[in-house]
C-alpha cells in the first residue's frame, strides 16, 4: 500500500487525522471514507434546509405581493369614487 491516499496514515491530508487515520491501511481508508460521507451528508442537509427556507421566503413574499395588490385595488377604487363624486 502506498502512502498517498486518504487514510494512509497520520500527517497526510493537512490535518492530524485522528487515531483511525493514524492506523493507516484499510482501517484508515474506511475511516476517511466514513468521514467524507458524513461531511457530504452534512452539506446535503444544509443545502436542503437552505432550499426549504428560500421556498418558504418566496411563498411569503408572493402572499405579501397579493396582499399589496388588494390594497392597491382598494385605493384605486376609492380614488374612482372620489373622482365620480367631484365630477372630475
From Swiss-Prot:
Region of interest: Disordered: 1-41
Modifications after synthesis and translation: Does not seem to include a transit peptide.
Keywords, in A-Z order: Coiled coil, Mitochondrion, Transit peptide
Compartment(s) of residence: Mitochondrion
This protein's GO CC annotations: cytoplasm; mitochondrion
GO molecular function, one term: ATPase inhibitor activity
Cleaved signal peptide residues: none
Biased composition (Gly residues): 1-18
Entry coiled-coil feature ranges: 39-87
Main subcellular location of this protein, as a coarse class: mitochondrion
UniProt similarity note: Belongs to the ATPase inhibitor family.
Function: Thought to be a regulatory component of the ATP-synthesizing complex in the mitochondria.
Protein name: ATPase inhibitor mai-1, mitochondrial
Taxonomic source organism: Caenorhabditis elegans
Gene name per UniProt: mai-1
